[in-house]
Amino acid sequence: MENTWKVIMTHSDAEPWWFFEDWKRDIVKEWEFDNKSEAVRKYLDECVALSREFPNMKTKKYNSIAFWNENEVVFCEACDDDLQMYHGIILFENDHLIENVDTLEGLKEEIQSLANEKL
């Protein structure tokens, strides 16, 4: 069986590393690749684009990254409060989460460097 790689973009009131039961509803874009290098390049390109659009970025596990603007919120009637909206990016191999492409801090630094470089 050949490996397939996916880059998935989400938009949700939960950061992309929280895989709640209905998390797939939050997928807004998905790209599939036959090789790792193309998938990682797309992942980095999308991270750079998101980092230019949204001033806040946080990495956690599974090479998931959340981007957000503090003004993008939705009101939750059930909790009677505003919820922050997040734009997430995640990398998968054979429909499994990838734990490490690089170290998370190294990845975050690379994204910031690429974002500044292409301006």
What residue ranges belong to the model's regions?
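Short linear motifs at secondary-structure transitions and domain/linker junctions
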Residues: 3-9, 39, 60-68
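Ordered hydrophobic segments in well-structured contexts
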Residues: 4-9, 30-32, 84-92
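Amphipathic alpha-helical interface segments used for dimerization/assembly
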Residues: 43-47
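A short, exposed loop/beta-hairpin motif centered on an aromatic-Gly-Thr core
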Residues: 24-41
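Structured domain cores in non-transmembrane regions
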Residues: 14-21, 36, 49-55
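Short, mixed-charge low-complexity intrinsically disordered segments
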Residues: 48-119
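Short aromatic-glycine-(Arg/Gly/Cys) micro-motifs in beta-strand/loop hairpins
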Residues: 1-28
